[in-house]
Amino acid sequence: MERGPVVGAGRGAGARIRALLGGLVRVLLWVASALLYFGSEQAARLLGSPCLRRLYHAWLAAVVIFGPLLQFHVNPRTIFASHGNFFNIKFVNSAWGWTCTFLGGFVLLVVFLATRRVAVTARHLSRLVVGAAVWRGAGRAFLLIEDLTGSCFEPLPQGLLLHELPDRRSCLAAGHQWRGYTVSSHTFLLTFCCLLMAEEAAVFAKYLAHGLPAGAPLRLVFLLNVLLLGLWNFLLLCTVIYFHQYTHKVVGAAVGTFAWYLTYGSWYHQPWSPGSPGHGLFPRPHSIHKHN
């Protein structure tokens, strides 16, 4: 007979704890939603500013040109100075894969939610196919430059012995070293990805301004792209500080910028191209007035 009140009190306490935890979860979800909304709005406003995008180009140029000077003021034994560090292996070496995955999801959601048309969505996604072709083509061109400008050397205790082997493949097969002009493919790829992601993400400001559907999944994907863009900037700075020769880095960044200009700055504005980011997604002002 005495157990009844005890059991009832235990059940009441458990119910109060569950209610308290449920309320706490709802508060945390509300805070997370508010932060997601606020963060995506502010990031979209920053990336959508034409003035800030021009300053961003100047920032990338300053990083590549003046960043190597920081090597005299940083610890050469830091983890980022090692070719085998986690970020270099997992992110830099697969930079295009990360960029294509994150940015592909963002472009897919933005274009399809704005137009509901598969053909238009596929056209905008084809910019990533062009980007992959640019990446592969540039990599092959860099190897060709290294082959044409290089010579074969055998490392000896006294120094290097020059060999007459005609090409890189036969030189490496013989266990020797091939030394030529090596354009920094990492600097090229990170520069190209930074410019490409900034250009694509800038569309989100106009997307929000037109009142198009922007739920939590889309905002989260957008912020993930912003975080990846920030990571690419940081890893580009680490690359120019710790790795490669100065001219190799500058040439790599220059080629990446030129590739961006040929595509986003020129070709994508033509009617026979994949189209520039945001092209055909939003109604023009005069068409809105005519409809009204």
From Swiss-Prot:
Residue ranges, Cytoplasmic side: 40-54, 116-141, 209-220, 271-292
Q: Where does the record place it?
A: Endoplasmic reticulum membrane
Membrane topology (Lumenal): 1-18, 76-94, 163-187, 242-249
GO cellular component annotations of the record:
endoplasmic reticulum membrane
Query: Keyword NAD, does the record have it?
Result: no
Query: Transmembrane segments in this chain: where?
Result: 19-39, 55-75, 95-115, 142-162, 188-208, 221-241, 250-270
Active site at which residues?
A: 186, 244
GO MF annotation terms = coenzyme A diphosphatase activity; diacylglycerol binding; triglyceride binding
Q: Which InterPro entries does the annotation name?
A: FIT (IPR019388), FIT1 (IPR046402), FITM1/2 (IPR046401)
Entry annotated with the keyword Transmembrane: yes
GO aspect biological process, one term = lipid storage
Q: Positions of the site: Important for catalytic activity?
A: 248
- What highest taxon heads this organism's lineage? Eukaryota
Leader sequence segment: none
Q: Enumerate the UniProt keywords alphabetically.
A: Endoplasmic reticulum, Lipid metabolism, Membrane, Transmembrane, Transmembrane helix
List the membrane topology term(s): Multi-pass membrane protein
Family in the record: Belongs to the FIT family. FIT1 subfamily.
HAMAP family, alphabetized: FITM1, FITM2
Q: What does this protein do?
A: Plays an important role in the formation of lipid droplets (LDs) which are storage organelles at the center of lipid and energy homeostasis. Directly binds to diacylglycerol (DAGs) and triacylglycerol.
Its protein name is Fat storage-inducing transmembrane protein 1
Encoding gene, per UniProt annotation:
FITM1
